[in-house]
UniProtKB/Swiss-Prot annotation:
Residue sites binding ATP per the record: 24-25, 66, 69-71, 132-134, 175, 185, 222
EC number(s) stated in the UniProt entry for this protein: 3.6.4.-
Protein name: Holliday junction branch migration complex subunit RuvB
Gene giving rise to this polypeptide: ruvB
Family statement drawn from the similarity comment of this UniProt entry: Belongs to the RuvB family.
Amino acid sequence: MVDDERVVSPETADDHEDSVEKSLRPQVLAQYIGQEPIKHELSVYIQAAKQREESLDHVLLYGPPGLGKTTLAMVIANEMGVQIRTTSGPAIEKPGDLVALLNELQPGDILFIDEIHRLPKIVEEMLYSAMEDFYIDIVVGQGPTAHPVHFPLPPFTLIGATTRAGLLSAPLRDRFGIVEHMAYYETTDLQEIVLRSADIFHTAIATEGAHEIALRSRGTPRIANRLLKRIRDFAEVAPDHDQIDLAIVDHALDLLRVDSAGLDATDIKLLETMIDYYNGGPVGLNTLAANIGEETETVAAMYEPYLLQRGYLKRTARGRVVTATGYQHLGRTMPDNN
């Protein structure tokens, strides 16, 4: 969950936002906007599996949060015409939890595990035989009466999603036959997503308004939809506005403190702290986090990725450094020693 004040967070804010996301989800690949190479590959794999009347190979989806990994898993289930059971790595605390999930699956069904990198080791190891040979062995009883019991499983598809693919063990990663990296979205795709969501919300929006929202959405559909939802409120109370136009978008996002590149107040504070107190860097992540009053993990997971992707920051062996692009965006002069 994310701080409600951070409108550009890629994480889900609360249960209400999660329910809104569900209402906006596409149901089939043809409705899914963006990620074209992945869609093309998956359409081939799905069609082939259906022709052979087999379950789809196991799928690993990895990439930054908010890009639609869960949505894509739902779409795959719809395209395959099977049921999907959803859970998360932290929710499967012990082998018995996994057994209960697997026991509910029918042939061809999908088990979706979000944050799969957070599975306990003992649960992960049980998955190996389930994924590879469709069986699990569990020990029943205790002490001298303990004995293994062999449980065959119906053929199923495991879809794992993670924002931290590097934390997956090699044995688990190697058991996924289909591995797809989800990248940040292009502005044109985000604009199309905003227009589609506005239509679902029954909200009139000008093309230039949708384009501006897309520009400030950090390449992330979840952020685009959240900004649209907030801006819709401004449009509905604004006099003499029958649609979300560019003026309303600019006004709303200025009040929300989201700048032209999608940076918010904390992003700006991070860059300005590095410039004002550390001459632009290099500065260590722990030091930087302490200076802006955030946890180190929060800075690494929530703030740094987008700043790196936009080229405002770079990593060096000695720490983080503000780039010339970062200085330029802030309207600051880069010192000669940088």
